[in-house]
């Protein structure tokens, strides 16, 4: 039988009580958000006639998600991260700010505290038996389009199994493997030697993949490399590049692929190029320049503060 009680005074009063709106104390913003989200969920239960069994399956699911530390993985899978980017893009458009280098999601796997160097860094420790050398370099430009020395370029990516150091279930990787901060040189350039990453897949037995299965969706990301770029007088840029040609480039479960962020990995076998780049054999090269945007009235109006692992 279908009953409709959501719009009764009883239920509406109850929502205010449960959200603390009839109480002194607490945090008004939290009350406002909880009241709205709770109301939307109560209404969904009524509209969709969600059963008690379905509801309790959801509660058990949330417990599992937390126990597996996967809330930050499900979030991009359900598009929240990309939606927040779309909102920031729209805010920028309304302010007339052009992002020559598009932003895209941070993902849940950044770790603060990576080794820092000027101009160049070797990112991998040479231990990945399937590693194919990658030389990745480019120039950071300021808001006027001039090369920007002394910008901080933080780069992180996965190994050839798609695992990130500090989050690697095999325990094979050393701390900060394939995580570096490079300060741009006097020409605004950064350069790293590393290995080509592989695409990433959600833990196959985890709760994120379990829900994606119910949606008929896969949990794969294309091979990608993350960036934070920050510099005085500029807004911090959070983005990623995708290695062109990956089967998931335009089918990313986390919806991070954007026009302008797909970069060719050009293969070099020529002995001259091998020598000039100081590598041992054939290697791939990717070139990616990034352009920053100015602070807005002296502040970074879009900097994201979120809990991050720091080592
Ligand atoms: C996820 C993993 C990533 O490497 C990433 O960049 C974004 C999201 C994830 O597991 O959700
Ligand atoms: Fe990632």
From Swiss-Prot:
Gene Ontology molecular functions: catechol 1,2-dioxygenase activity; ferric iron binding
Cofactor(s) in the UniProt record: Fe(3+)
Documented EC number(s): 1.13.11.1
Catalytic activity: catechol + O2 = cis,cis-muconate + 2 H(+)
Residues where Fe cation binds: 164, 200, 224, 226
GO biological process assignments: beta-ketoadipate pathway; catechol-containing compound catabolic process
Protein keywords: Aromatic hydrocarbons catabolism, Dioxygenase, Iron, Metal-binding, Oxidoreductase
Pathway info: Aromatic compound metabolism; beta-ketoadipate pathway; 5-oxo-4,5-dihydro-2-furylacetate from catechol: step 1/3
UniProt binding sites for catechol: 164, 224-226
Stored CDD domains: 1_2-CTD
The UniProt record lists the keyword Oxidoreductase: yes
The protein's assembly and partners: Homodimer.
Family: Belongs to the intradiol ring-cleavage dioxygenase family.
PANTHER family linked: DIOXYGENASE, PUTATIVE (AFU_ORTHOLOGUE AFUA_2G02910)-RELATED, INTRADIOL RING-CLEAVAGE DIOXYGENASES DOMAIN-CONTAINING PROTEIN-RELATED
Domain characteristics, as noted in the entry: Contains a helical zipper domain, consisting of five N-terminal helices from each subunit, which forms the molecular dimer axis.
Name of the featured protein: Catechol 1,2-dioxygenase
Gene designation per UniProt: catA
